[in-house]
């Protein structure tokens, strides 16, 4: 978690080795980038993909951390950055006919989410 001055507060949270392909997760996180916390949660709850569940847990956890540790309201937060990186493959073998094996690669990925406080500037005339 990174703490700056009042207008630059941000919460950075990440999770590693989610058993899902990065391609499928990117399809979900591209929809919430730049939205406020409330809009992001609503989008994730109504999308029909399995990849929404870990992203929803992570966004909710980041907002709770910002509320508890830095005293920020959830309504003041927006999704500044979302990054999904490919992780390593879990390698398995599937038995095939005539004593052969077939390799199976189960992909993993890492998610990084940065929530920032909305800054409102008043223009002086």
Curated annotation (Swiss-Prot):
Location (main, coarse): plastid
GO biological process: translation
Transmembrane segments: none
Pfam assignment, any one: Ribosomal_L22
GO CC annotation: chloroplast; large ribosomal subunit
Domain of life the protein comes from: Eukaryota
Keywords annotated in UniProt: Chloroplast, Plastid, Ribonucleoprotein, Ribosomal protein, RNA-binding, rRNA-binding
Family annotation (InterPro entries): Ribosomal_uL22, Ribosomal_uL22_bac/chlpt-type, Ribosomal_uL22_bac/org-type, Ribosomal_uL22_CS, Ribosomal_uL22_sf
Intracellular or extracellular location(s): Plastid, Chloroplast
GO molecular function annotations of the record: rRNA binding; structural constituent of ribosome
NCBIfam families cross-referenced by the UniProt entry: rplV_bact
Role, per record: This protein binds specifically to 23S rRNA. The globular domain of the protein is located near the polypeptide exit tunnel on the outside of the subunit, while an extended beta-hairpin is found that lines the wall of the exit tunnel in the center of the 70S ribosome.
Quaternary context: Part of the 50S ribosomal subunit.
Family to which the UniProt record says this protein belongs: Belongs to the universal ribosomal protein uL22 family.
Protein's name in the database: Large ribosomal subunit protein uL22c
Gene field: rpl22
């Amino acid at each position: 978690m990174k703490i700056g001055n009042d207008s630059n507060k941000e919460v950075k949270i990440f999770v590693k080795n989610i058993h899902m392909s990065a391609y499928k997760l990117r399809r979900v996180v591209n929809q919430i980038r730049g939205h406020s916390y409330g809009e992001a949660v609503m989008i994730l709850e109504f999308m029909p993909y399995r990849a929404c569940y870990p992203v929803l847990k992570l966004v909710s956890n980041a907002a709770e951390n910002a509320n508890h540790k830095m005293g920020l309201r959830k309504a003041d937060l927006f999704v500044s950055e979302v990054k999904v990186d490919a992780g390593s493959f879990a390698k398995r073998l599937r038995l095939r006919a005539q004593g052969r094996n077939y390799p199976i690669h189960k992909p993993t990925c890492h998610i990084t989410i940065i929530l920032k406080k909305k800054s409102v500037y008043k223009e002086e005339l």
